[in-house]
Regions:
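Donor/substrate-binding cores of folate-linked one-carbon enzymes
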Residues: 1-92, 96-98
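An anion-binding loop in the catalytic cleft
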Residues: 103-214
Length: 214
């Protein structure tokens, strides 16, 4: 992470979960605290709008390796600088299994998308449908007045629908679910005791005509 932001065990995951646009890598001196040592070098990277934790992890691994080489060169050359972190920091604690369950009553479409991205490929965000555990691996978030969404749902009036209600489940058009603010479209999904697959293949074998995720 870009210290002192996200000290702790899961900085990459929390950057994605929180919908951050920028993260990065920091090299530092070790001390007695968790990620509290003086900083040496930093490198920023943009986080893609649809980028998952796994994808970002791979990019940062390469960047981190290159930054480490530069850091070691500076130490060897005697040009290294120590930069104190200061007290303006945030913590990135370990993820809990409980946070993987989607809370439809509190999270809007963008927050659910960030949850799905942040827990991919670790754990996977999930919900229950008809008592079965369904994992979401890739979703899109729409505002309710989005033109592209309107082309799919037509003139559907879903003002009386509750968060978690299925608006459309069609193997060709997709799976659309209402949230407290906005709509998500599920693109990659995993049924209970099944493998990950695109939503079209899933809907050809799993009937979701009406009902709600909870």
């Amino acid at each position: 992470s870009l210290l002192p932001k996200y000290r702790g065990a899961a900085p990459i995951q929390w950057a994605v979960l929180n919908g951050d646009k920028i993260t990065g890598v920091t090299t530092m001196y070790m001390d007695v605290g968790m990620d509290t040592g003086d900083m040496i070098l930093k490198e920023e990277v943009q986080i893609g709008e649809d980028e998952t934790t796994g994808e970002l992890w791979e990019r940062l691994s390469v960047i981190g390796g290159n930054l480490l080489v530069r850091t070691l060169d500076e130490i060897e050359n005697g040009t290294v600088k120590r930069i104190p972190q200061g007290e303006d920091f945030t913590i990135a604690p370990m993820l809990s299994k409980e946070m993987a369950k989607i809370d439809w009553q509190s999270k809007n479409a963008k927050e659910i998308k960030n949850l799905v991205r942040g827990l991919n490929p670790i754990m996977g965000a999930y919900s229950l449908f008809d008592g079965k555990k369904i994992k979401f691996w890739k979703v899109r978030a729409f505002d309710e007045d989005d033109v592209e969404l309107g082309k799919v749902l037509g003139n559907m009036d879903f003002s009386d629908k509750e968060a978690g209600d299925v608006l459309l489940a069609d193997s060709k058009k997709g799976l659309f679910i209402k949230t407290v603010q906005g709509v998500i479209s599920v693109e990659e999904i995993q049924g209970e005791n099944a493998k990950r697959m695109n939503v079209g293949d899933f809907l050809r074998g799993f009937s979701i005509e009406d009902g709600c995720f909870c």
